[in-house]
Amino acid sequence: MVSHFMDQSECRESTFISKDINLLEQKTEKALKLKKTLLLIGVSHALLDLSEFGIDLSEAIIMETGGMKGKRLEITRGDLHKLLCEGFNTSRIHSEYGMSELMSQAYSLGEGMFRTSNWMKVMIRDSYDPFSYVKSGKTGGINVIDLANIHSCSFIETKDLGRETDSGFEVLGRFDNSDV
């Protein structure tokens, strides 16, 4: 997905960076000089690794796409964002919520509240009864209906914990002992 958007942007400076801190610093400096917005997208564990180098990304948009993928201990999204904000010297972290089984994603602009497209619906199920749903404001497991999945299953049950509100939904973490 990121590769597609990089191609569409026609920005020659777009690139993938793994652990090349020097390249990240060069790209950051160049974006600032050109008055371009830098968008850094990465999985949680990789962003945490980068944040430990203390690069000032206060002018960048940082978007985590979730998941420690077994590389680090799972922590809450709130704790993750606090560490990333401190490490990158920024006030907020944007987020993407989705998985390879879905065609659509939900996005948060940095306050932890995710919003979906009109064809995607998130429902919060009871943690102890997978056939029951909880009221708005209560915590439970996240179920997703994605009508964009026209050639595959349009609904999935995740092992993520969440809470729905009037303005969207929050992802609070994973069920204990759930698979990565």
Where are these regions (language model features)?
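Short, solvent-exposed amphipathic alpha-helices that sit
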Residues: M1
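Active-site glycine/GP-rich loop and adjacent strand/helix microenvironment
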Residues: H4-V180
